[in-house]
Amino acid sequence: MTESFEIFDVVIVGGGPSGATAATDLALLGSKVCLLDRAGRIKPCGGAIPPKLIEEFAIPDSLLVARVNSARMISPSQTAVDMPIEGGFVGMVDREHFDEWLRQRAQAAGADLRLGTFERVTRAADGTAIVHYRPAANASRESTSPTSRQMRARAIIGADGAMSAVAKQCIAGADRIRYVAAYHEIVRVPSGATQQFAATRCDVYYQGRLSPDFYAWVFPHGDTASVGVGSAHKGFSLRRAVEELRKLSDLAGVETIRR
């Protein structure tokens, strides 16, 4: 007896902004789409979206937690340059709520949203991809079912991040792609502007002590702010860099909401 599988035109692994948006667009075009998203940490991200992208991707005002109208660039020599933002402002979003809204939009467009963890891809005799995954045990995604499931896909989109498990299985050399690791903390901001922090300004630091090869950021989110750094150097302490960054930006003593 031949085992039967659900067949999708496209299976998208990863329900972040790229995966969820692809699911929405493909579903609206009439494709049968499955969006597979797993439980996991919220990725470190400043959450900035330029006005042109807010319009192009129809992001509602209700998702914007702040509007930033300037950016400050701090050089290795401590020179700070303030620049106005083209288009008037950059919208700031909280990725925890923004990503979930994008997934719900994809589902409303007709995509089949499934909670679970991607395991592997195999091929049927006719070459069709078989996606193996482990469903979440409950809606809170706190654990996965012990039983693996399968579905067929005419195409697979690996939107599961820089260290994509899909890419590693399907694309030669994907495991050697360089990537930047990032770490951020969401903190409560002071009630008013301080000497180094302003609620309507993004700060970007290009300083070796904060990141030897990337940059550090302080992005306001209304009552909170994302304070983070990135680096490709595996021996570099991102947590210590964020601790230093909080001191520099007058955010050392405020409440830490999320790490």
Please give the residue ranges for each predicted region.
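Glycine-rich FAD pyrophosphate-binding loop
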Residues: 11, 24-45
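N-terminal Rossmann-fold NAD(P) dinucleotide-binding loop
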Residues: 19-20
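A conserved beta-strand/loop capping segment in the N-terminal third of enzymes
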Residues: 52-105, 115-116, 123
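Beta1/beta-strand and adjacent pyrophosphate-binding region of the FAD-binding site
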Residues: 2-16
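Predominantly flavin-linked oxidoreductase catalytic cores and closely associated redox partners
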Residues: 29, 105-255
